Each structure stands twice: as structure tokens, then as C-alpha cells.
Amino acid sequence: LGIKVLYITPLRALNRDLLERLQWWCNNLDIKLAVRHGDTETRERTRQARSPPDILITTPETLQAILPGWIMRQHLRGIRWVIIDEVHEMADSKRGSQLSLALERLRLIVGRDFQIIGLSATIGTPEKVAKFLVGNDREVEIVRVPVARHMKLKVMFPQPTSIDNELASRLYTHPEVAARLRIIRELIEKHQSILLFTNTRAISEVLASRFKVWDVDFPVSIHHGSLAKTSRIAAERGLKDGALKGLVCTSSLELGIDVGRIDLVVQYMSPRQVTRLIQRVGRSGHRIGRIAKGVIITMDSDDTLEAMVIARRALKEELEPVIVPHKPYDALAHQIAGLILKKRRLYFYEIYDIFRKAYPYADLTIEDIEKVLRYMHERFPRLAWVSFEDMVALKPRRTKALFEYYFGNLSMIPDEKQYLVVDETSDSPVGILDEAFMAEYGKPGTKFIIRGSPWKIIHVYGEKVYVKPVDDPTGAIPSWIGEEIPVPFEVAREVGWIRSVVEEKMKQGKKPEEIALELAHEYPADKEDILRSLNETIEQISRKQPVPTDKRITVEDWEDFVIIHAHFGSLTNRALAQLIGHVLSEQTGYTVAVQHDPYRIFVQTMGITTSKEIIELLNKLAGMPEITIRETLTRATVKTGLFKRRLIHVARRFGAIKKWVDFSSVSLKSLVKSFEGTAIYDEALKETFTKDLDVKHLIQILRELKEGKIELLKLENEGKGSPIARIGIERVSMKTDLIPPERMRLILIESAKARLLNEVRAITCVDCWNYVEMVRIKDLPDNPKCPRCGSNALGILEEEEESLLSIMEKKGEKLTKSEKKLMDK
């Protein structure tokens, strides 16, 4: 009796997919199977309560929702197996921490232990994830399947040709971009089905629209999380059925959603992390004995060297370690609320005994529990009534706030707001900026690129960002930067190591071609592409100038900037940039703007500092004790928009701020003042230091600098910028992303036209009610008619075919509320 197997997946789309795949087996083996998530209809939920399935497929959030329910708790008592799919997606996030606590609550309900099975394609530290899966002090077995033997990778750095110049003018773009598109198109035409992964939604939209402007009938579509469900399902089916040859996608298709057989995976630009590359390329060759094939198309020298390093590491299975969040307080508060819902009186030691068995909370203390309960007790309305003398938490008399908090915060995924960008001169909308971008850069005076043009933020009001166009793009930040995946410390250092090898071998008298050939034996790329990616390095060495490496930081002046070349990755460089910016601001009294990428830091000097002074500052930082570095960085961090964003996310998860509260309307000072000394403040700081900054490696490189293991050199260039600096300057001046306004207008018109023509809608006849079909807008005739009765009375809905079948059966009469709502669309 009751549910025997609980199958937990990170995505609703995976639930739908699993249901389709398991249905046949379950029907033939007489096993009851059901899916439950946020969109499950009331009728289906009632059916599950009356007659529980043997296997329940669900998400972590829905498990949270059913744990307090009296009837479902009875059904959960029969559980013998819990399967967690795509476990790597959970382990390094707060969703995973929350799930690990929920599984401890589930053990309380079941009254005995059950077997947990975790499934994942790519894990950097299997032992850690295994412990995360089963909890502390429980036995676990790891079954490894080697991936490298079954994977073939190649890095390509396309060179523009005369054909690309012609194509560039047709597509209103640059020859370099046209060359990349041409290579991708050739790959798509040579294969049956391809997944084309990008790192951000913005880039996937641009790529898909460029293909459609090139050829509206080209069988490629787009797939990402922001698309309507119907468009996503139509794209998945199109690839599965062979109507499409390729899908441009983001991480939405990284996980195991079934899109049929994939011959090849193309990664547009460096995947930035080894695990991501393996996960993405692993989507191809999904048959026993088949090889997974992947091609990485790169855009510049940094991108190519980075992709080469990541590809080599993937083939050698040198994956990034999984970082499990350290006893997050927000997940703990939510799970304590879940316990209080079912038990009127809870002693601190009871909470401690239950939750310390979960791996992220292995070193949980009574003080941690007290800190979280103090907030729950002191807030209004209370989430718990706590006696700190007796060390006991009681359910509050009025439980409305407790229920609202628990069921309103089932998800640990932060609600990211979006901001409308408005041109102040014409009051017309320009585009959208996300919360991540606004947190780090959303201040008046910031220059950024959106829709191919540079703009300057004038002021932010509510959810609108008022801007005006500017002529000089130097220092402008691309609007999609908030979405970018951080490059790990180890990857960036290996890029620096390649540059040091080239320098060493050239000093020994070797020719660049010979060096490129040697590197081609180590890295999966052609000699010619490797040689092109080393152009700037070779040029700098030929000028008798030192190049930045894994063991050398170089500093130089360029126009209004000081450039610090540091091969230490995104999070270490961000921490170093923040530290430099803060110390310089304290010294000069001016706000110093800093930008960073995985290989360099740009300090906008405004004439107040030089490369010589930056070198002195770096040496001063290297001489600081570790505790002083941490304290200085903490002081710097709490003043940033990044910290404000994390603080708001944590406060929302604690129920301290309503989900709709506007990010920009809350002053950072008042926020910090409100939460200082609370569990919310501590957790926000912890999250910032885990997700946004890499303090461990920052301290390591400063120590190596002090010990002389890393050298620090000034480059003399008369302010012109060294060859390697040019790569960063190209990015910071955004030359390749700028498009003249008149060409931009043509691009937007053509892109919108192509996108609308490729939308898929459900067409249904409201006369005979016997016809429903998913049709691409482009394929509709000028005068569409019902093929069954010839009527012109056709309705067009943004829904799936299946969801309209019940309406068809009823001939549009005696509809339920949800069916009427659907028809009114």
C-alpha cells in the first residue's frame, strides 16, 4: 500500500519526459505511475490522495508541499526507494541543501531508512556528492562509468574569408560573426540533428534570429527557460520527429530531456567549465557503443585557449570539485517551519538530532539553530514562539503567517526581477536588463551595450532604467554579463601556463609553428587555430616584452585605465578587483570603477592613479595578514550591489521581504542596518563569498606574490596597450558588438518577422470540434479552413494539443473553470 518509489527530478519538463518513457513499462508490469508538480490539476491530486501510485515522479519543491499533508504523509510511509535524477544539479545549490533536510523529515515519516539512488552524468567529486545524497554516517556505494573514452572533442577558431564578408553584409553583422555562423551551418547540414549550446539566453536569441534572417526555412529553432511552454515542447518534438535539424539552446537542454538522437553538440564560445562541457556533449551519441561528439566554436584568442584547456580537462576527466553550500540558514529556517507545522513543541536538540544527519549540516550547532529561531521568534508576525531559557520552540497561536511562509517559499531558486530599459530622450523601450546585471552595474553613469548600441544609465526608477545613447563605447559592459558562467581558477591558470610555455620555447629558438604543433598533440585543436589563438602572445614575446602567465602578473597603463593581467579566473579576479577598488577609494576619497574578466582587471583611473601605484598597492595587499584581507574584503563587499542582491534573495527566502519588493527601491544602507547581526545578514555574506567571490584562491595568490612564487612586472607601452591587452580592450570597447542604428533597425525587423513566422500554435475548429493541430505560423495558408468540415471558424491558442482534447470531447460546452479560462485566451 502507498507510494513505493519517489522519483525526484530538478525540472518539471523532465517529469513530463519520464512519464512518457516509463508509461509503457508500468502499463505492462501493472505498476501505477503518476506525476505531481505545481501545475498538477486538482482532479489528479484528489485521485492520488484516494489511490496513491506505486511510483510518484516529482520535483524537490513539490515534495516540500506534500510533506505536511496528512493524507499524503500516510501514503509516503510505504516508501522503499528514493531516486534523485541529475543529482549534480542539486548538490551545489540551496535546492539540494533543502532537499537533504526534506529527506531527513521523510525518514521521520517512514520510520525506517530507505534506499537512495542518485543519477548523474558528470560529477567532479563523487565521494562528496555520495555523502550529500545519503547523509552523514550512512553507507554508500559509487558506481563509476568512465566518460572520456566515449567522447570526441574539437575546438575551432573560424577565420573570416571573402564569402564571410558578403554574408556579413546580408546579415548586418561582422565578418568574424559570419564566419562562425557559416561553420555552424556547415556542421548542421552535415549531420542529422544537432544541439547548439550558448552560455546566455541573449546569445541564443541572437544566433537563432541570425539563422532565420539568413534563411527563414532553415530547420533550426530555439529552446530556453524563458520561452512559452508550447514553444519549448514544439521545439523538442520538432527535433525528435526530424522536422528540425538543430536547436539553439541554453542550459535548459543540458539535463536529460529526450529530444531524440543527437549526432553532434556544438558549443558556441567557450563553455567556461569542464562539467558543463561534458554534460552538454554527453547529450550526443546516446546509445551503447556510440561516441559523444562535440565541437566548440570560439570568438577570440582568450576564448580559444580557454576552450582548449576545458576540452583537454574534459577528456582527462579533470572536473571542477562540487562545492556544497555550508549549512545555509535560509533552507534551515524553512525546514524548521515544516517541522513546527506538524509538531506543536520542538526542543532545540530534537531539531539538531534530525538535521545534523544531512551532509550540508554535518557541523550544525545548537548556536546555529538558536540564531535561526531568534529571527523566527522576533519577526512580526512570529513564525515560532521560542523560549531560549528552556531551549524549546512552540507553534505560534496564530498560524496563518507560518503557513504562508512555508508554502510561499517552497523554492530556494531566487525570483529574479527584470528591468525595462527606457530611452529618456524619446521615452521608448530599448530592451530588458536582469537583476544580476543591475546588482553589479546598475548605477547612474554606467555605460552598457544593449541591442548593439552603447547607452548610459541616467537614473533608475522602480522597475525602469532610464538611459541615453552615448557615442564612445569604451568601458561599456555587455547587458548579458550577469548571466555569464564563471571561469574556474584552475582553467584560467592553465591558460597562463600555455602562454608561459610559448614564451619559454620561443626563447629556446623554436618557431611558433613548431610550438603550435606540439600543443596540438596535447589539446584537441588544429595547429592553424592554435597558432592564431597565440598571435598576440607571439607578438608580445617578439617585442621582447614579458607576457602574463600562471606565475606572472603584468600591469600596464592604457588610456584612462590601468590593466592588471592576472590569470586567476572570474571569482578570484572579482575579489581582487573589489579589494583594489575599495582600498583605492579609501586612499583617494573617489569612487574607483573596476571591471574584470577571467584574465585581467581594468581599473578606471580618472587620473588619480597609475600602474606604478597599482603595483605598490598589490605588494601592500600581499603583505597583509589573512584576517586583514578577509575583513577588508568584507567591508568592501557589503557596500556592493552584488551583496545587496544576495541579501534580498536571502531575506525573501526567510520571508522577511515580500517577493514583489523592488530591488532598486530599497536602499542598501537601510537593508544592511535592518538585518545586521541576524541569520539573514550572515547567510547573505556566506552566499556572496561562495557564489560571487573566491577568497581562498585570492589569499593563495597574494601569499605566492609575497613569497616570490608569482612575479609582478610593469609593462612600458606609452599607454598604447600590449598585444595581449588588445584582447581585453576589444571586449571592453565592445567593437564586435556595436551595430549602427540604421542597420540595427533592419536586423530587428527581419529578426521579429522570422521569429513570428516560426512560432507554433494550436489551431482548433470551433464549428465541428473535430480538428486540432499544432501548426507553424509560416505554414498557415492565406485562407485557413478546417480540413474536416471546411469552416473558417478556427481558433488559435498558445496551448498544447493534449490540453485541448477534453474541450474537443465536450464540443466546447459544459466546460470547467480552467477550460473556460483557456478558451477565453
Language-model regions: role of each:
Residues 352-355, 359-418, 478-479, 483-825:
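Extended, highly charged accessory segments
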